[in-house]
């Protein structure tokens, strides 16, 4: 072997080692900045991979982050679609019948027609209620006059960690050859969501104490967030959200908002903004410049098109609306010890 080759070989080894180290340390940042997932099965390239179905965009994104490209993933309720108005498509039944694992939220989040498809499938697929398993003692809220379990557990990143762990455990059970990969990815998700939790607390703490009041069209969906970060939730707009309210009801809501002295009210992405704008004008408050993502993730290319980005986008909307100081979330590099 020539002296030149002997000289360059150790340099090459050093370069590879440095590259691997940098990739491991920067994974958390890359995970946060990764592009949005697709909402359809990926087609020809992975047709022989185990088929997995996820019902909503939050669970779908977490499955994608845990599993990477080891499964053929089909996502049913697209980002931006109100789950209550979702109608199963022709291919949904086929995807459910062919799936090895079906991940759904639970706590009655899925519309009845979709839930019946899942429960009625006869293929022996594992049917995993991710939110129910992750958070067995959920918060309660009043719906149609009854106290029921609140399904929107993902609005607290600590619950997001538990959801990722449920997904990872069940993928590992069904596809044991990839268990190491799933466990490693889940640890990376956990590290980043813990960082996000700290960042959200700091941003909410920057809001003046007198403004830490939350009025939104779908504040029931944000209960896990408001409770975790000590925002007083004032359930006013729920009374007129997505219904045709009477003038008397509008006046009642306007009075309640004025009493609350909030500077800004919030609209979520699935609500009708016309009535809310009328209420805001009469109550002399602002409507937040950005919509909240309460029911699902943002559409591909939007600010909230992954789980982590949704949490940061909602936090920005709330902090800026209530007079706090918004600073961009910058995930810290975490070394990969595996």
Question: Predicted regions span which residues?
Answer:
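Generic secretory/membrane-interface signal
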Residues: 6, 17-20, 150, 308
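N-terminal secretory signal peptides that target proteins for export/translocation
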Residues: 1-7
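Bacterial N-terminal signal peptides
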Residues: 10-24
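Extracytoplasmic metal-acquisition and chelation regions
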Residues: 12, 25-338
